[in-house]
């Protein structure tokens, strides 16, 4: 059994601000079409939302879009932290630590009031599992890594979905 990861960063204006194709056009419509197809065929999917400098100031808009419009049951919020190869400084797309923290707090406050047990957000579920002494499925909270195999669209295979880059191929 597989869980398909769909990369989408929120509603159209937030997603298309950072996710464009080779022609510079936003990919929102294609992603939504793919989601419709997955739902039609009852394929389980997980939202992979990169939190960046653009959508990082809109936690409730992003979360409510996934919950209410996409009807996502599983969501991951992954911070964008990119460094310029020459200078080593963070790129303008990177989310600041403060911005990412406020984003997670905004989502958590909404989630804990309304959606615990119906919407699964990886960081929050992992924290709760740890608190209860239960097993969790995220390697950054585990003694070892490699329990979540990833197959990318181009066929590349990784042993962890948190280290999907050439150094870990």
Locate predicted features.
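Radical SAM/AdoMet-radical enzyme domain recognition
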Residues: 1-80
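A C-terminal junction/extension of Radical SAM enzymes
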Residues: 86-167
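Active-site-proximal loop/short-helix segments
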Residues: 81-85
